[in-house]
Curated annotation (Swiss-Prot):
Residues 239-254 have a biased composition (Basic and acidic residues). InterPro entries: Myocardin-like, RPEL_repeat, SAP_dom, SAP_dom_sf. It comes from Xenopus laevis (African clawed frog). RPEL repeats lie at residues 15-40, 59-84, 103-128. SUPFAM superfamilies: SAP domain. This is Myocardin-related transcription factor A. The lineage of its organism: Eukaryota, Metazoa, Chordata, Craniata, Vertebrata.
Length: 936
């Protein structure tokens, strides 16, 4: 803004102020008007102010007079009297007053609301009995004033005078209601019961038009008086009545607000002065309240059912009552020989039902303090006691009313009412079924506890209430009643589940007992086999015809049998036959025996090193010519043995038998060595194939597993890194490249490498000499299975490729992935491996009970030259099987038959699949400890 603009603005303001000063009144004018006090004579100033006020008042009156209506208008408005009026002043005043009131009343009547609005606003009071007769609807609270005319607001009861001038003589609705409600409790219950009319003939509709009708609390109200004349009264009276009625209706509203949404008060306990509502809204509200009552009744039934099971049994009932309870779980009760006539009216509620049935009461629940107020009131209603007061008063009233004498009498009350014949179920669907002339039978779907012959009162009373509710609701409330009837079957289905559980437990106990019996039988069989081993040890050169098995025994040991591991998993084994595992203490032992089904293995390390290996038995038959075993001469990976190793005493059992109708052939291509050492092993492996990694893969897996399991124990002698080799245990058709060599030729080809004179090596050599001599096994088999016979350089071993081992499958496609070492042995010798119990279900005594617990693991290893080196074995299943990584801490090199107890090592599952024959759910990975000790 520039300086020029500022000057222009100031100039404009100056001009405005100058104009205002020119138009300002002088001081004299201000003094004359009383705005400013005069400078002189203050007394004159005050007098002047009074004169100004008088002048102002006069001016106001003059304006009013100028604006007043004409005389004719005042006469028309009855403010001024007419010139022809009576000379008496009192008569004129009365006439003017009446005319004025009449005009006011006519104007209000022309603008008055309709009758429904008057009822909603509680301006038009109507008695309950009058409503039932005039309206004739199903709900006592519903008010339908469509039959009223516009003059019904001025209706007076017959006791009231027709013309009343003063306000005090007009009885208000509030004054009428207490007089009606206070007369009802004055009657005794016996009088109230006598007033209720029973009989089937009272169901007709004519009872609604009778002079004596039943109101909501079961009492009869005489309405012999004629209906009040609904005529318009004289004009002076209604203004006072109107003014009083406009002021009074606000008083009863707080009584309605005291009701809570979860408290249901039946119509017989509601005051008649409750404000009426619209018919449609009242119907909805009534239905909601009745549905809420149904829910409360259902809760009370279930709670009372639970309490009844704890309370002592009531006195012994009649014989017919016992017959009724034994014939059906539903208790059928007949209210009386005739149905109550008041069921046709919708106002009958649980109070009438209790009176009709006989005031049934029952034992109190124990936890009264935990019950809700509504539940306590319901118990009080069942006993006919008042329900008013606080919760403590209700509890004390219930405790005072329930003593042993009353409890006994109350429990014996319903017995005369109950029927002795088989129950008839009459479903209550709507009020139409109650209009028959037959006795009404109510079925209680909430059955009493089995131990209590006396039925539950709450169930019967609640069904009586349901019948009343269905009478009030009609077909609309039929669904909740049927739902209540259908609730109990769901509760009755729970006992079969418990029975099924008991049956399952008993079945499992029976299975455990059977397994224990079979375990004992197999223990006897193992003892017999041990004796045979001892005999064969003393006479190892007998002919094949006299021998039952080939035995090489070094030490005699007891063969205890453990059942704990079988019992641990017996609950998860349902349809699999189990065979026991042979568990040896003190010294390590290896047993390879026949199996009836499945692949199993078990090791228990509680007392000593124990290991059991089995391979599955093919379920097919092979021709006789396939029973021979031919080993081919192929290059084998050499191994270096520690010269100072000494083999401990061991007992190795290799038995052969030919199973019935099963003659499988097993093809073994030599070039690998089985190296097994026992540990805490309980796996189940599907021996579809093995894969071993050497070189880089071996080192990486070895370092990873050693780091995970025992980080403080690294491999002491790492091996060189040759290219990785793999060994697969596969199945192929029985094809051989050449005929097996003779015994003499095999003995010539056998290297003589037992110069160290170790006892373990000599025992192995002697053992395989016996095998070769009696079973016609080529001598190459001893080269590949006895590592002490060959010693080569580590570099030669690293450079050699590992050949394959093939196991010929049987023709059966189901078990084609399974091979057994026992089949290999029994197909070679034709003699049974185990004697006894072959005809029964436990003829395979070593395997059947181990199918769900473990599976033998055959390690086809090409071990590195260093005896301190660790080896990893990776199982690569061909089908759906379990892959495992097995790592081993540094151990001393020993023979392949040596079983030792080195530090524990872990068997970690790489992946979990569902096996083709068994389930991997039985695997316990934390128990899979496997020791592999091979030295080639």
């Amino acid at each position: 803004m520039t300086l020029l603009d500022t000057e222009q603005a100031l100039l404009a303001i100056h001009t405005v102020l100058q104009l205002k000063l020119q138009q300002r009144r002088t001081r004299e004018e201000l003094e004359n008007q009383g705005i400013m006090p005069p400078l002189k004579s203050p007394a004159a100033f005050h007098e002047q102010r009074r004169s100004l006020e008088r002048a102002r008042t006069e001016d106001y009156l003059k304006r009013k007079i100028r604006s007043r209506p004409e005389r004719a208008e005042l006469v028309r408005m009855h403010i001024l009297e007419e010139t022809s009026a009576e000379p008496s002043l009192q008569a004129k005043q009365i006439k003017l007053k009446r005319a004025r009131l009449a005009d006011d009343l006519n104007e209000k009547i022309s603008q008055r609301p309709g009758p429904m609005e008057l009822v909603v606003k509680n301006i038009l009071p109507v008695e309950t009995s009058l409503k039932e007769v005039i309206i004739d609807v199903d709900y006592p609270e519903v008010v339908d004033n469509s039959s009223f005319d516009e003059d019904s607001s001025d209706a007076l009861s017959p006791e009231q005078p027709a013309s009343q001038e003063s306000q005090g003589s007009i009885p208000s609705p509030i004054e009428n209601r207490p007089s009606e409600t206070t007369q009802i409790p004055a009657l005794s219950p016996s009088h109230a019961f006598s007033c209720v009319q029973f009989g089937t003939d009272a169901f007709n509709q004519d009872s609604l038009q009778s002079t004596a009708i039943t109101i909501s609390n079961g009492l009869t109200a005489s309405i012999c008086k004629s209906l009040p004349a609904l005529v318009k009264q004289s004009q002076p009276k209604p203004s006072f009545e109107k003014s009083q009625r406009i002021k009074k209706p606000k008083e009863p509203k707080p009584k309605v607000k005291k009701l809570k949404y979860h408290q249901y008060i039946p119509p017989d306990q509601k005051q008649k002065g409750t404000p009426a509502m619209d018919s449609s809204y009242a119907k909805l509200l009534q239905q909601q309240q009745l549905f809420l009552q149904l829910q409360i009744i259902n809760q009370q039934q279930h709670q009372h059912y639970n309490y009844q099971t704890i309370l002592p049994a009531p006195p012994k009932p009649l014989p017919d009552q016992q017959n009724t309870n034994s014939s059906s779980t539903t208790t059928v009760r007949s209210m009386s020989t005739v149905a109550p006539s008041t069921l046709a009216t919708p106002t009958i509620t649980r109070q009438n039902s209790n009176v009709a049935v006989g005031g049934r009461t029952g034992p109190l629940p124990h936890n009264l303090d935990e019950m809700k107020v509504a539940e306590l009131k319901l118990e009080l209603k069942h006993r006919g006691l008042p329900v008013s007061g606080t919760k403590i008063d209700l509890i004390e009233r219930l405790k005072a009313s329930q003593d042993p004498s009353t409890a006994t009498a109350a429990s014996a009350k319903p017995t005369p009412v109950q029927q002795a014949k088989p129950p008839e179920v009459v479903p209550i669907v709507s009020s139409s079924c109650l209009t028959t002339r037959e006795p009404i039978k109510l079925c209680s779907t909430s059955s009493t506890p089995p131990g209590s012959p006396c039925p539950s009162e709450v169930s019967v009373v609640s069904m009586d209430e349901v019948s009343m509710i269905s009478d009030a609701l009609g077909e609309t409330v039929a669904c909740p009643v049927t739902q209540q009837v259908q609730q109990n079957p769901a509760a009755e289905k729970s006992p079969p589940d418990a029975r099924d559980k008991d049956l399952m437990l008993r079945e499992k106990d029976r299975q455990i007992e059977e397994l224990t019996q079979r375990l004992k039988q197999k223990q006897e069989l193992v003892e017999r086999l041990r004796q045979q081993l001892e005999q064969e040890k003393r006479t190892p050169q007998h002919s094949t015809d006299d021998q039952q098995a080939l035995i090489l025994a070094v030490k005699q040991e007891p063969l205890p049998l453990t059942v704990d591991s079988i019992n641990k998993k017996a609950s998860s084994i349902v349809k699999q036959e189990l065979n026991t595992a042979i568990i040896c203490q003190q010294e390590p032992q290896l047993l390879i025996g026949p199996v009836s089904s499945g692949i199993e293995g078990k090791v228990d390390n509680s007392a000593g090193t124990k290991l059991v290996f089995t391979l599955t038995n093919p379920s097919s038959q092979l021709p006789e010519e396939n029973r021979q075993i031919v080993l081919q001469k192929v290059p084998t990976p050499p191994s270096s043995l520690h010269p100072n190793n000494s083999l401990p005493k061991q007992e190795v059992l290799l038995s052969c038998c030919a199973l019935q109708n099963q003659k499988p052939a097993l093809q073994l291509v030599p070039g690998t060595v089985l190296s097994l050492s026992s540990s805490n092993l309980q796996p189940m492996l599907n021996m579809n194939g093995f894969q071993k990694w050497h070189g880089e893969a071996l080192d990486s897996l070895q370092k990873q597993l050693v780091h995970n399991e025992s980080p403080a124990t690294p491999p002491q002698q790492p091996e060189p890194e040759p290219p990785p080799h793999s060994i697969f245990l596969t199945h192929s058709s029985p094809q051989w490249s050449k005929n097996p060599p003779g015994y003499d030729e095999a003995m010539k080809q056998q290297p003589n490498s037992c110069e160290d004179g170790r006892p373990g090596c000599l025992q192995a050599v002697d053992f395989f000499d016996v095998l070769i001599k009696n079973l016609d096994i080529p001598s190459e088999f001893k080269d590949y299975l006895v590592p002490c016979l060959k010693q080569t350089s580590p570099s030669h071993q690293a450079a050699q490729m590992v050949p394959q081992v093939e196991m010929a499958p049987p023709p059966s496609p189901i078990h084609s992935a399974l091979g057994r070492l026992e089949d290999f042995l029994e197909s070679s010798t034709g003699t049974p491996l185990l004697r006894g119990h072959q005809d029964g279900p436990s003829s395979m005594p070593l395997i059947d009970d181990l199918h769900s617990q473990m599976l033998s693991s055959l390690a086809i290893l090409d071990h590195p030259p260093s005896p301190m080196d660790t080896s990893d074995l990776h199982f690569s299943p061909i089908g759906n099987s379990l892959g495992l990584d097995i790592s081993e801490p540094p151990l001393d090199g020993m023979d392949w038959l040596e079983l030792s107890e080195p530090p524990a090592m872990n068997l970690t599952p790489l992946s979990t699949f569902t096996p083709s024959v068994f389930s991997t759910d039985f695997l316990d990975s934390h128990d899979l400890h496997l020791h592999w000790d091979s030295c080639l």
